[in-house]
Amino acid sequence: MDSERFLRELPELFENFPHSEHPVDRRFAPIVERVENLARENNLALLNLAASCLGPDEIYVEVGVFHGASLVAAMLENEGRFVGIDSFDFRDGSLETVEQNLAHFGVGQPELLMGDVFELVPAGALGQARAGVWYYDALHTYEGQIEGLRIAEPWLAPGAFLIVDDTDWEQVARAMDDYLADQPRATRVLTIDGKDRGFPQWWEGMQVLEWSA
């Protein structure tokens, strides 16, 4: 993961980062308009940039796919191995809907794993791969949040990013703080407030952690 490039180029995607209502490049607007989602163009631009910074042997893992908006955005004009994991029990989420949205935007076919991440990953669903990005947007209870990061640790490449959504939520923010206090290999490199703190253009906030070697 080229973390230096990510942190250098992220502000360049916007006229006034993080205050801009949307990125300069509006290619993510059709995704937000077509696909039911819980994100904004800004969130999608961040994920797309992160995916573009992966190392040659690293994979992108998304936990919590819903209708596929963020996965489509991450894959847009990026190559590599992408993995989406979801039990599809949130609202009307379904594997079929995700596949339809992937096909509509022509981004190729990721590996879509249907089931509980806390069962699939320990059972070897990722094989010997190393994740350069672990994007967690699933169970946002305090315990679920911490475990959603811990479960990734054996598969993280040196310098990998752990990206977490909805960090405005009190239990998520607290879980992030406690995880960092307990895990010296993880460092918070970016915090972006969301609508609860005056930045609705970032939905409900994001944080990025970097995993050291």
Where are these regions (language model features)?
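A short alpha-helical cap/connector motif
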Residues: 1-213
